[in-house]
Amino acid sequence: MFTDLAISGGPGLLTAPSEVQSTFTRVSNTQYSNCSSIFRLGERTFTRQYAHIYATRLEQMRPLLIKSAKQRWGDDIAVRKLCELQGGEKCCVIGTLFKSMELQPSILREISEEHNLLPQPARQKYISDSDELILEDELQRIKLEGATDVQQLVTGAVLAVLGAEEDAGKFVVEDFCLTSLPVQSPLPRLSEDRFVLLTSGLGLGGGSGDSLMGLQLLLDLVTGQAGAEEDQGCAARISRVILAGNLLSENTQGKDSLNKAKYLSKKTQAASVEAVKMLDEILLQMSGSVSVDVMPGAFDPTNYILPQQPLHRCMFPQSALYSTLQLVTNPYEAEIDGVRFLGTSGQNIGDIYKYSSMQDYLDILEWTLQVGHLCPTAPDTLGCYPFYKSDPFILQNCPHVYFCGSAPKFSCKEVTGAEGQRVLLLTVPEFCSTQTACLVNLRTLQCQPISFSGFGADDELGD
């Protein structure tokens, strides 16, 4: 795709100098709209309980699931609340899942056992054969048995189940369904190729020289300073860059300094300070050439809970002068030349990975699209703001490109909805470990990785 454009009859790197002055004209975003206002926090009150967000989530998603249930099981299916169940009656029940997990970390358990047992080692996954699913609605809860995938499903997902209540007070499930994809706006018809470059996990301050080499090559590519004239012409078609979180390394968190006496750390400087200065210089180079959207991540200097608010412009005294630099929320939703992008920095996908049997980030990304919610495990195992009027993480519009950052590897696939929705799923890998970025063609919705790992020091030593 992107590479094919550069393979033509144009001059290469080893051609004689030309008297014709080469030009680098960047394509512009004629149509751009930041649609992330729903993730901006105005009043911040943390005195409310988290029960409100589960109640409003169920209230908002119930009509969607009733529609999906009737499409799947027929219009004559009886939809009951848990308090209306009658023994043996086959019906449909809609509720929020709670997954009872023996291995799930609990601060209360840690406090009660800290004097008697050694701390449990960190696990990649917390699922076990003893896990149970419980369905809750506004008033009651009931244990689920039967045709449910206990290992795959997670707490917080809202779904419809078909079955009957047994005498023992358990609901035997025959089938279950998730919500259908929301309405999608039609794709625009672009006359030329335009690209959006996505990368994540720059990991600044981590001390890896290889990743900095790859990062500089990435900057040279985006700004049109790498390759021959034809390559630069292709780079000029990159209309926007999205940095999907974790711009700083986990090593910059400086948690060790919290345990030191003040007189030992008074004259030391946090590792994140130099990393932010480096980020400012990178954004200065990039935003001077192309529009850049910067999303925060788990290791970046902003609030920890979702939705993460934009990084403050005061941290970037050089690059903040450019109007092309846009500091955005996580999650982030925008419309670029008529193509709707929606994505996160990866915390939601990584959290589901721990509490589900799903192994592939791309499968988890597709599952969140099917369940109609960006982060169903919030607020149980993933921190989020205690919303009470509405749940902003419910999918209101079907995106054309749905991505997550900080993934272990690059992967993409296209899924099609029941009403013809076409969605490109994309996992953006950590740049600091893979030296890989992603290019999305807005005209065709095709995606390809661009790797800079072949330029690392390890490869040179290996030769």
Swiss-Prot record:
Name of the protein: DNA polymerase delta subunit 2
Compartmental location: Nucleus
A GO BP annotation: DNA repair
One GO cellular component term noted in the UniProt record for this chain: delta DNA polymerase complex
Keywords: DNA damage, DNA excision, DNA repair, DNA replication, Nucleus
Similarity field: Belongs to the DNA polymerase delta/II small subunit family.
Superkingdom of origin: Eukaryota
Molecular function as annotated in GO: DNA binding
Protein's job: As a component of the trimeric and tetrameric DNA polymerase delta complexes (Pol-delta3 and Pol-delta4, respectively), plays a role in high fidelity genome replication, including in lagging strand synthesis, and repair. Pol-delta3 and Pol-delta4 are characterized by the absence or the presence of POLD4. They exhibit differences in catalytic activity. Most notably, Pol-delta3 shows higher proofreading activity than Pol-delta4.
InterPro entries registered for this protein in UniProt: DNA_pol_a/d/e_bsu (IPR007185), DNA_pol_D_N (IPR040663), DNA_pol_delta/II_ssu (IPR024826), PolD2_C (IPR041863)
Quaternary structure and partners: Component of the tetrameric DNA polymerase delta complex (Pol-delta4), which consists of POLD1/p125, POLD2/p50, POLD3/p66/p68 and POLD4/p12, with POLD1 bearing DNA polymerase and 3' to 5' proofreading exonuclease activities. Following stress caused by DNA damaging agents or by replication stress, POLD4 is degraded and Pol-delta4 is converted into a trimeric form of the complex (Pol-delta3), which consists of POLD1, POLD2 and POLD3. Pol-delta3 is the major form occurring at S phase replication sites, as well as DNA damage sites.
Coiled coil regions in record: none
Main location group: nucleus
PANTHER family: DNA POLYMERASE DELTA SUBUNIT 2
